[in-house]
């Protein structure tokens, strides 16, 4: 069972070393789940004397006003008889103190290091472990004494600040409260009892200690309180007799003081029947046994909390990403790896693993055919326009059989209008690819760490897409222009035969501009243009996919990679300038994860029975 208190001691020390003081923060706290005994009392209540009596050593700073200005986590470890007793501070891990006057001075010095030489207070605890044959395994937290007025050099808020600090410890359900009250004062006004009842109205966590019993007025005693008939608590009150100021001045040692305490309760008529339940030695043993029971009951819940929190912290740490490499090669590798992840996500969008790529197909299957269908050839093939273009093409020599130049001009003027839908398809696919770049950037978790790299990758990808669009537009419009520059001969070779089948080809050339003839020309041109549209409907998507989609998958960041190879250390570092908030969060999560893993190992190493 003694291992359980040692276990909690180790975890408490790890908590303090890694910044978990149980204060409110955005991080999970292990400190709050650990059972502890907090010592609460007003100034001059005898709180320090009780602690020194339990330890059996003079080691606490003394003086007027507020002496305890930081929580002192006092961890007592029983060692074998005959072994020399010593003390260790968590902040001085390799130094053993055998002179307890030096311990007192170090407590004062460490307090001043945190608070300055003012009379301010701090919630950051000091950890002190004392190893002695004369103690029981016990952990106590000495809190600043409650006060009603501020002294010179202290802020007006000190009274409330101390109360808030004390309350922050004792209001936690795993905290056992040791309420110190002087017997020579009215218990109804006890600061310790008052605040304890506020946070623990049922008294399930509160132990009462009466000090200065030997200083009560003649004719009065504390029997009713100690017997539980007055100011009743769930656990029995314990009376103690501490050294007087005169004893302290005379350097009366603790062994003699404990002996005198035992004799006082044994020899005083009023308390003789309670003697075996009084005194600092009984108090220490009672608290040690109670703390053991509480720890044992809490261990399963602590284990469950630790295991759950470790998983949560590991998940968040993974999401935050790895810390930045220090050397140029490491930085370059990190950037390339992040870019590779982005590129992979972008390809997954195009290949259908992620949503978005289907929009490109929709352009070819719906948007382009619909745009071609909406083209208005009526204007080019209106009767007046056909007559105008045919006669202009003939010049001063009318055509003999078929108005070839007229056909060419009519076809060219109609096919040119296809450039609009072709160009629109290129632009639409470009917009889709840009949107997929932004989506891929947002979905690349690693890019969230580095805002500068995020901007550079986005800009580089968009710049590449812009160049690909220009190449695609040029190639696609060339397809349209090729249809204008060379007509499909086989289509027109059939026209004379059709003419012969339909009538007299030797009809007067002056009658060939009649409406029937012109309509026939218009019909032939429209048939040819429709044939061209059908062909371009298939070839334009191929050109766009080849020049834009395929190239985006192959070489979206090639130019950026080439630039990376020329960057110096300063430029690479600027790309990996991480958001300070993320850096701080990762550092905090790493420390807290280290704490929980250490606690996990400590619990696993202790043999305890459920």
Curated annotation (Swiss-Prot):
<keyword id="KW-0493">Microtubule</keyword>
<keyword id="KW-0007">Acetylation</keyword>
<dbReference type="GO" id="GO:0048766">
    <property type="term" value="P:root hair initiation"/>
</dbReference>
<dbReference type="GO" id="GO:0010051">
    <property type="term" value="P:xylem and phloem pattern formation"/>
</dbReference>
<keyword id="KW-0547">Nucleotide-binding</keyword>
<dbReference type="GO" id="GO:0009536">
    <property type="term" value="C:plastid"/>
</dbReference>
<dbReference type="GO" id="GO:0010091">
    <property type="term" value="P:trichome branching"/>
</dbReference>
<keyword id="KW-0132">Cell division</keyword>
<dbReference type="GO" id="GO:0009506">
    <property type="term" value="C:plasmodesma"/>
</dbReference>
<dbReference type="InterPro" id="IPR000375">
    <property type="entry name" value="Dynamin_stalk"/>
</dbReference>
<keyword id="KW-0653">Protein transport</keyword>
<dbReference type="InterPro" id="IPR019762">
    <property type="entry name" value="Dynamin_GTPase_CS"/>
</dbReference>
<dbReference type="GO" id="GO:0080157">
    <property type="term" value="P:regulation of plant-type cell wall organization or biogenesis"/>
</dbReference>
<dbReference type="GO" id="GO:0072583">
    <property type="term" value="P:clathrin-dependent endocytosis"/>
</dbReference>
<keyword id="KW-0968">Cytoplasmic vesicle</keyword>
<dbReference type="GO" id="GO:0010036">
    <property type="term" value="P:response to boron-containing substance"/>
</dbReference>
<feature type="region of interest" description="G3 motif">
    <location>
        <begin position="142"/>
        <end position="145"/>
    </location>
</feature>
<dbReference type="GO" id="GO:1905952">
    <property type="term" value="P:regulation of lipid localization"/>
</dbReference>
<protein>
    <recommendedName>
        <fullName>Phragmoplastin DRP1A</fullName>
        <ecNumber>3.6.5.-</ecNumber>
    </recommendedName>
</protein>
<dbReference type="GO" id="GO:0005737">
    <property type="term" value="C:cytoplasm"/>
</dbReference>
<keyword id="KW-1003">Cell membrane</keyword>
<dbReference type="InterPro" id="IPR030381">
    <property type="entry name" value="G_DYNAMIN_dom"/>
</dbReference>
<feature type="domain" description="GED">
    <location>
        <begin position="518"/>
        <end position="610"/>
    </location>
</feature>
<feature type="region of interest" description="G5 motif">
    <location>
        <begin position="241"/>
        <end position="244"/>
    </location>
</feature>
<keyword id="KW-0472">Membrane</keyword>
<feature type="binding site">
    <location>
        <begin position="242"/>
        <end position="245"/>
    </location>
    <ligand>
        <name>GTP</name>
    </ligand>
</feature>
<dbReference type="GO" id="GO:2000114">
    <property type="term" value="P:regulation of establishment of cell polarity"/>
</dbReference>
<dbReference type="Pfam" id="PF02212">
    <property type="entry name" value="GED"/>
</dbReference>
<feature type="binding site">
    <location>
        <begin position="44"/>
        <end position="49"/>
    </location>
    <ligand>
        <name>GTP</name>
    </ligand>
</feature>
<feature type="modified residue" description="N-acetylmethionine">
    <location>
        <position position="1"/>
    </location>
</feature>
<dbReference type="GO" id="GO:0005525">
    <property type="term" value="F:GTP binding"/>
</dbReference>
<dbReference type="InterPro" id="IPR027417">
    <property type="entry name" value="P-loop_NTPase"/>
</dbReference>
<keyword id="KW-0131">Cell cycle</keyword>
<dbReference type="GO" id="GO:0006886">
    <property type="term" value="P:intracellular protein transport"/>
</dbReference>
<keyword id="KW-0963">Cytoplasm</keyword>
<dbReference type="InterPro" id="IPR003130">
    <property type="entry name" value="GED"/>
</dbReference>
<comment type="subunit">
    <text>Forms homodimer and may homooligomerize and heterooligomerize to form the phragmoplastin complex. Interacts with AGD3/VAN3. May interact with CALS1. Binds to AHK2. Binds to SH3P2. Forms a complex made of SH3P2 and DRP1A and triggers its accumulation at the cell plate. Interacts with DRP2B at the plasma membrane and in forming clathrin-coated vesicles (CCV). Binds to PHIP1.</text>
</comment>
<dbReference type="InterPro" id="IPR022812">
    <property type="entry name" value="Dynamin"/>
</dbReference>
<dbReference type="GO" id="GO:0000911">
    <property type="term" value="P:cytokinesis by cell plate formation"/>
</dbReference>
<dbReference type="Pfam" id="PF00350">
    <property type="entry name" value="Dynamin_N"/>
</dbReference>
<dbReference type="GO" id="GO:0030136">
    <property type="term" value="C:clathrin-coated vesicle"/>
</dbReference>
<dbReference type="GO" id="GO:0005856">
    <property type="term" value="C:cytoskeleton"/>
</dbReference>
């Amino acid at each position: 069972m003694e291992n359980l208190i040692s276990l909690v001691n180790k975890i408490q020390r790890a908590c303090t070393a890694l910044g978990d003081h149980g204060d409110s923060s955005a991080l999970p706290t292990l400190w709050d789940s650990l059972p502890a005994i907090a010592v609460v009392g007003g100034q001059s209540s005898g709180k320090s004397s009780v602690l020194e009596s339990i330890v059996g050593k003079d080691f606490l700073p003394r003086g007027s006003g507020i002496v305890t200005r930081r929580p002192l986590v006092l961890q007592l470890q029983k060692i074998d008889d005959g072994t020399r007793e010593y003390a260790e501070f968590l902040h001085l891990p390799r130094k053993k103190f055998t002179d307890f006057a030096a311990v007192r001075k170090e407590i004062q010095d460490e307090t001043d290091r945190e608070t300055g030489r003012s009379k301010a207070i701090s919630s950051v605890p000091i950890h002190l472990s004392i190893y002695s044959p004369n103690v029981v395994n016990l952990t106590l937290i000495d809190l600043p004494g409650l006060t009603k007025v501020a002294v010179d050099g202290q802020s007006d808020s000190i009274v409330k600040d101390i109360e808030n600090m004390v309350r922050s410890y004792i209001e936690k359900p795993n905290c056992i409260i040791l309420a110190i009250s002087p017997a020579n004062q009215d218990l109804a006004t006890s600061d310790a009892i008052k605040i304890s009842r506020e946070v623990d109205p049922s008294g399930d966590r509160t132990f009462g200690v009466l000090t200065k019993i030997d200083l009560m007025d003649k004719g009065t005693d504390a029997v009713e309180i100690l017997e539980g008939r007055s100011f009743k608590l769930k656990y029995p009150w314990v009376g103690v007799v501490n050294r007087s100021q005169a004893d302290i001045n005379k350097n009366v040692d603790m062994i003699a003081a404990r002996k005198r305490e035992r004799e006082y309760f044994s020899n005083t008529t009023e308390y003789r029947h309670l003697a075996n339940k009084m005194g600092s030695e009984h108090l220490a043993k009672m608290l040690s046994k109670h703390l053991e029971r509480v720890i044992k009951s809490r261990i399963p819940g602590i284990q469950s909390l630790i295991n759950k929190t470790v998983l949560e912290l590991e998940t968040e740490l993974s999401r935050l990403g790895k810390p930045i490499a220090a050397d140029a090669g490491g930085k370059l590798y990190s950037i390339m790896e992040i870019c590779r992840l982005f590129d992979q996500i972008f390809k997954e969008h195009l290949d259908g693993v992620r949503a978005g790529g289907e929009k490109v197909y929709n352009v070819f299957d719906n948007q382009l055919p619909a745009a071609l269908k909406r083209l208005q050839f009526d204007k080019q093939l209106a009767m007046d326009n056909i007559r105008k273009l045919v006669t202009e093409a003939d010049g001063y020599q009318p055509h003999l059989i078929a108005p070839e130049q007229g056909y060419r001009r009519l076809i060219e003027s109609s096919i040119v209008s296809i450039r609009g839908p072709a160009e629109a398809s290129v632009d639409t696919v470009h917009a889709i690819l840009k949107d997929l770049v932004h989506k891929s950037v947002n979905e690349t978790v690693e890019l969230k760490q580095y805002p500068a790299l995020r901007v550079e990758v986005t800009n580089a990808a968009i710049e590449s897409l812009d160049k690909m669009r220009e190449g695609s537009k040029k190639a696609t419009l060339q397809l349209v222009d090729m249809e204008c520059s060379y007509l499909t001969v086989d289509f027109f070779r059939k026209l004379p035969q059709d003419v012969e089948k339909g009538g007299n080809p030797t009809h007067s050339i002056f009658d060939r501009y009649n409406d029937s003839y012109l309509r026939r020309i218009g019909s032939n041109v429209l048939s040819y243009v429709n044939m061209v549209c059908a062909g371009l409907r298939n070839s334009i998507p191929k050109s766009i996919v080849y020049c834009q989609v395929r190239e985006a998958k192959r070489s979206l960041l090639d130019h950026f990679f080439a630039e990376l190879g020329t960057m110096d250390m300063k430029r690479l570092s600027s790309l990996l300038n991480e958001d300070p908030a993320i850096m701080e969060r990762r550092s905090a999560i790493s420390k807290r994860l280290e704490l929980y893993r250490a606690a996990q190992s400590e619990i696993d190493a202790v043999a305890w029975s459920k």
